[in-house]
Amino acid sequence: MAKTRPGVASKIKTGRKELDSYTIKGTNKVVRAGDCVLMRPSDAGKPPYVARVEKIEADARNNVKVHCRWYYRPEESLGGRRQFHGAKELFLSDHFDVQSAHTIEGKCIVHTFKNYTRLENVGAEDYYCRFEYKAATGAFTPDRVAVYCKCEMPYNPDDLMVQCEGCKDWYHPACVGMTIEEAKKLDHFVCAECSSDDDVKKSQNGFTSSPADDVKVRLSLFSHLLYRCSITYL
């Protein structure tokens, strides 16, 4: 199975009837409109495609087709994968398609970014999405994203960060001269800028669950971040 190019819709024949659901071949898993699914790629060496099912149809011969909206992985986007992209990150695109239901391999869950960061255990079927992506132009929505640390990068939930009890900003251990092992042993952390501040109040636990839960954040244009990271990657 291969994705069609954005803007090139598959031919849809008349005489189709809409179905409420489809059972994935060889399983008891039922797919309905609104579900997210894993679809078999044309290249067996690549990970499965991820799509959101918009509609399910069958023709007179009971050939079932699914109308889907593709999720793109960062490496499939015009900007490419960057250091702040998580391994399970996806972009909801404006690329719609029609594919055979037989290409569906399984179901998955695409969480909101905040809900994903609250998962106690991330399973193989768990993904997250924080951006929508226009496949033709490479534009992202929203065009601004929260940034943290001295490096002013968005939060990657795969990376450990520590929170300063003074300014409440989050930091990568490497950016403040610590190893990950040292950071894991911390009960409290105060950044260099706050360490001389006598008004910093020590709490029993200075860590909230994750940067995604913070209300006060700095914002940066996402396009600028992609450009900065592309220079870093050279």
UniProtKB/Swiss-Prot annotation:
GO CC annotations on file: nucleus
UniProt keyword list: Chromatin regulator, Flowering, Metal-binding, Nucleus, Transcription, Transcription regulation, Zinc, Zinc-finger
Keyword Magnesium: no
One Pfam family named in its UniProt record: BAH
Segments forming PHD-type zinc fingers: 146-197
Example GO biological process: negative regulation of long-day photoperiodism, flowering
Coiled coil: none
Tissue: Expressed ubiquitously, with higher levels in floral buds.
BAH domain mapped to chain residues: 29-144
A single MF term (Gene Ontology): zinc ion binding
Record flagged with keyword Transcription: yes
Outcome of substituting P41L: In ebs-1; early flowering, especially under short-day photoperiods, reduction in seed dormancy, plant size, and fertility, and partial suppression of LEAFY disruption (e.g. lfy-6) effects
Observed effect of gene inactivation: Higher H3K9K14 acetylation in the genomic region of the FT locus leading to an enhanced accumulation. In ebs-2, acceleration of flowering associated with a shorter adult vegetative phase. Other developmental defects include smaller leaves and siliques, reduction in seed dormancy, plant size, and fertility, and partial suppression of LEAFY disruption (e.g. lfy-6) effects.
Localization (cell): Nucleus
InterPro entries: BAH_dom, BAH_sf, Zinc_finger_PHD-type_CS, Znf_FYVE_PHD, Znf_PHD, Znf_PHD-finger, Znf_RING/FYVE/PHD
Effect in UniProt of substituting W170A: Impaired H3K4me2/3 binding
Quaternary structure note: Recognizes di- and trimethylated histone H3 at lysine 4 (H3K4me2 and H3K4me3). Interacts with HDA6.
Similarity remark: Belongs to the SHL1/EBS protein family.
Function summary: Chromatin remodeling factor that binds to methylated histone (e.g. H3K4me2/3) to prevent their acetylation (e.g. H3K9K14Ac), likely by recruiting histone deacetylase (HDAC) complexes, and thus regulating the transcription of target genes. Negative regulator in developmental processes in a gibberellic acid- (GA-) dependent manner, such as germination, flowering induction, and flower organ specification, probably by modulating developmental gene expression. Involved in the chromatin-mediated repression of floral initiation and controls genes regulating flowering.
UniProt protein name: Chromatin remodeling protein EBS
Organism: Arabidopsis thaliana (Mouse-ear cress)
